[in-house]
């Protein structure tokens, strides 16, 4: 089934200049970038976006990291895009991620783990609408 998912290339990816490397993994998996932009999240935006984690002990550090520099937000489209992208990302902890995944090959730590991807269809829709209006998403 064709679906969409949100991808965020985190500040560590932008700072290290590996945006193109990460996008290569995404496209090699058969996913199409149908919307993309670079932005710098404010503290309030990061807190709202990651509100589901507000009560978790890592929340303050997550917000601090996600606001530490620019990010690249993308809408990806493809067959089973959510599951495919989660496979390409690899496990949250790069030490546990399979070789050949974005996190295994590029992430420096569990905190600076390169990418965010929606975990289910409802969250994908919510997360996409957080960053993009429908007129900003293009069919390819």
From Swiss-Prot:
InterPro entries: NDK-like_dom, NDK-like_dom_sf, Nucleoside_diP_kinase. One of its GO terms (biological process) is GTP biosynthetic process. Its main location: cytoplasm. The active site is at 116 (pros-phosphohistidine intermediate). It is an enzyme of class 2 (transferase). One of its GO terms (cellular component) is cytoplasm. Its EC number is 2.7.4.6. Its cofactor is Mg(2+). SMART domains: NDK. Pfam families: NDK (PF00334). Keywords: ATP-binding, Cytoplasm, Kinase, Magnesium, Metal-binding, Nucleotide metabolism, Nucleotide-binding, Phosphoprotein, Transferase. ATP binds at residues 10, 58, 86, 92, 103, 113. It catalyses: a 2'-deoxyribonucleoside 5'-diphosphate + ATP = a 2'-deoxyribonucleoside 5'-triphosphate + ADP; a ribonucleoside 5'-diphosphate + ATP = a ribonucleoside 5'-triphosphate + ADP. It is found in: Cytoplasm. GO terms for molecular function: ATP binding; metal ion binding; nucleoside diphosphate kinase activity. Homotetramer. Major role in the synthesis of nucleoside triphosphates other than ATP. The ATP gamma phosphate is transferred to the NDP beta phosphate via a ping-pong mechanism, using a phosphorylated active-site intermediate. Belongs to the NDK family. This is Nucleoside diphosphate kinase. It comes from Anaplasma phagocytophilum (strain HZ).
């Amino acid at each position: 089934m064709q679906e969409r998912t949100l991808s965020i290339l985190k500040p560590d990816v932008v700072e290290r200049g590996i945006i193109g490397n990460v996008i290569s993994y995404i496209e090699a998996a058969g996913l199409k970038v149908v919307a993309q932009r670079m932005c710098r999240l404010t503290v309030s935006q990061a807190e709202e976006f990651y509100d589901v984690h507000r009560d978790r002990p890592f929340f303050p550090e997550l917000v601090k990291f996600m606001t530490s520099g620019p990010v690249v937000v993308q809408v990806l489209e493809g067959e089973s895009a959510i599951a495919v992208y989660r496979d390409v990302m690899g496990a949250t902890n790069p030490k546990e991620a399979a070789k050949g995944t974005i996190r295994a090959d590029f992430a420096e730590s569990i905190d600076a783990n390169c990418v965010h991807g929606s975990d289910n269809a409802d969250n994908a829709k919510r997360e996409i609408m957080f960053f993009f209006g429908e007129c900003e998403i293009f069919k390819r």
